[in-house]
Amino acid sequence: MGRLDVKNSWIEFHQDEMTSFLKLAIIGTVLLGVAHGANLTAAEKETYCELRSAIQTFLCIERLRDFAAKVDELDMDKKSELKEFKKTCDSLKNCFAITRCGPNSTMDEAELFRMVEKNCEAVVYIHEDFSDCSDKLTAKKSVCFDNWDPIPDGIHLEEDEKKVEKMKKETCKRYFGKDDCMKKEIVETCSQKEWDKFREQFINLSSDLVSKCDFSRLG
């Protein structure tokens, strides 16, 4: 299975440019603002909110680094690692939830939060809800399952809209493996019911990516 991508533009933070003193000063400013936040005017509250959100995002960067490292190193067959990965997911989701100082958040924040959430859901689903069928496919040495990689590498990083659309069209064709081989493998090895759940789960998980795909061929 392919790696689950995380948006590099958020991860590539030049930490060396920020001294320890400045970090402490920033955190101190935020804590001081929390203590006096109730006395701010409407305009001041908006500015304070933006500052708090920005600093919270800064603090979330380290958790995002940890998340990215664990995604790359995650051994999909070890439940102990899955348990730790879930803790990282929960921690990161809580962290970015705090950055939303008001009812709205920036597009980048919302996109990143949604992507992290869906990546976590995908891993948890495969190793909890789909674990029995996954074990059977692994024992069978299914080539289709072993090669299955629904999300094109780098699609979230590509800035050329034409290239993105081309990648999406290719994804529609092989989202469930070459010639939709995952359907055949899951139905034969597990059950029709297992396939129905699997299909629904992964179409929902990547709804932004495959929203224009025609999966009527899957029945």
Swiss-Prot record:
It comes from the Eukaryota. The chain crosses the membrane at residues 21-43. Keywords: Glycoprotein, Membrane, Signal-anchor, Transmembrane, Transmembrane helix. Glycans are attached at residues 104, 204. The keyword Secreted does not apply. One of its GO terms (cellular component) is membrane. It comes from Caenorhabditis elegans. Residues 44-219 are extracellular. It is a single-pass type II membrane protein. It is found in: Membrane. Belongs to the UPF0376 family. Pfam families: DUF19. Residues 1-20 are cytoplasmic. Its main location: membrane. This is UPF0376 protein C36C5.12.
